[in-house]
Amino acid sequence: MDGWRRMPRWGLLLLLWGSCTFGLPTDTTTFKRIFLKRMPSIRESLKERGVDMARLGPEWSQPMKRLTLGNTTSSVILTNYMDTQYYGEIGIGTPPQTFKVVFDTGSSNVWVPSSKCSRLYTACVYHKLFDASDSSSYKHNGTELTLRYSTGTVSGFLSQDIITVGGITVTQMFGEVTEMPALPFMLAEFDGVVGMGFIEQAIGRVTPIFDNIISQGVLKEDVFSFYYNRDSENSQSLGGQIVLGGSDPQHYEGNFHYINLIKTGVWQIQMKGVSVGSSTLLCEDGCLALVDTGASYISGSTSSIEKLMEALGAKKRLFDYVVKCNEGPTLPDISFHLGGKEYTLTSADYVFQESYSSKKLCTLAIHAMDIPPPTGPTWALGATFIRKFYTEFDRRNNRIGFALAR
């Protein structure tokens, strides 16, 4: 493969850097770490099982969902989690019940499957379930919660309990899910989701978990940062890590370059162009870009991605764009113009060979995704981008910082 990445069949294992499940117990004065594992995405799992993605229909690639709480409904852009590849662990209750979760800057609520989920829902059988009767700190709320995904409805009710994340304990309102569609969640290696977004995105305006952590005053800074390991060949490597309260200089080099958010309430910034090689091809007049840790790929509007793929010579195959693998190393660089600086991805960063696919075709980690107003139209910079650029989310100053990952 001439040094460029191969998508692993099964994800990276956690490198054990201490005895604590949720963080380093000795790290009490600076910041807290959450170690991440890498997993096969739901889409990868479906392909490995020979599922014809075309038969599932286009709704499987759509990003728009509606969230409902009680009698209130609001449109919120959420990752569909079909391509999510990284998860960490949290504990809920006293004593803690451990769950694998996606940490998602594109949403703001916490939810996990509930022991009250009927075994008729196969997805619940395959996941860890929260049992309120086993927690001495549990408090009942009961407000109905529904997340309407394009692939099915996830619903349940709100509860309150102590959540342990990165060695920090916080009293948190979260969703206990009692109804989950078998597809896609039966194939997900993660149990639930921890939203790292703003309260403006939270259904029912439930205070997000990071806001509650900030209010405790236990962090050095009101920031959190993401590192995704690019060493996908080494199964013993750390899949990645989240740092609460700062950034880890072991995983980036140089200084951070900061870009202010478009507005408070969403992790979205201004982009001034997308270049292929030396030519600015897209977004010449400016556009928006979400920085989305819940997504694996980079995405843009259908019209933008079609133009980009034409320039790259890529062909569409179901929901993916592919090239001949021997052409991959010759593809041009793609640069994203953010805050007066170009962030460049080489073909090694955005082309990969799927272990279950023909060796003659390789997939581009770039997808089309049409996000409607008011958040869209917008690009979304997911793990494809974050693997190359260590990313810091600064709540105090409403900005995002990037530094070259190492």
Curated annotation (Swiss-Prot):
This is Renin. One of its GO terms (cellular component) is extracellular region. SUPFAM superfamilies: Acid proteases. GO terms for molecular function: aspartic-type endopeptidase activity; insulin-like growth factor receptor binding; peptidase activity; signaling receptor binding. Residues 86-403 form the Peptidase A1 domain. Belongs to the peptidase A1 family. Disulfide bonds join 117-124, 283-287, 325-362. The active site is at residues 104, 292. Renin is a highly specific endopeptidase, whose only known function is to generate angiotensin I from angiotensinogen in the plasma, initiating a cascade of reactions that produce an elevation of blood pressure and increased sodium retention by the kidney. PANTHER family: BETA-SITE APP-CLEAVING ENZYME, ISOFORM A-RELATED, RENIN. It is found in: Secreted; Membrane. Residues 1-23 form the signal peptide. Residues 24-66 form a propeptide. It comes from the Eukaryota. Pfam families: A1_Propeptide (PF07966), Asp (PF00026). InterPro entries: Aspartic_peptidase_A1 (IPR001461), Aspartic_peptidase_AS (IPR001969), Aspartic_peptidase_N (IPR012848), PEPTIDASE_A1 (IPR033121), Peptidase_aspartic_dom_sf (IPR021109), Renin-like_dom (IPR034135). GO terms for biological process: amyloid-beta metabolic process; angiotensin maturation; cell maturation; cellular response to xenobiotic stimulus; drinking behavior; hormone-mediated signaling pathway; juxtaglomerular apparatus development; kidney development. It is linked to Renal tubular dysgenesis: Autosomal recessive severe disorder of renal tubular development characterized by persistent fetal anuria and perinatal death, probably due to pulmonary hypoplasia from early-onset oligohydramnios (the Potter phenotype). Tubulointerstitial kidney disease, autosomal dominant 4: A form of autosomal dominant tubulointerstitial kidney disease, a genetically heterogeneous disorder characterized by slowly progressive loss of kidney function, bland urinary sediment, hyperuricemia, absent or mildly increased albuminuria, lack of severe hypertension during the early stages, and normal or small kidneys on ultrasound. Glycans are attached at residues 71, 141. The lineage of its organism: Eukaryota, Metazoa, Chordata, Craniata, Vertebrata.
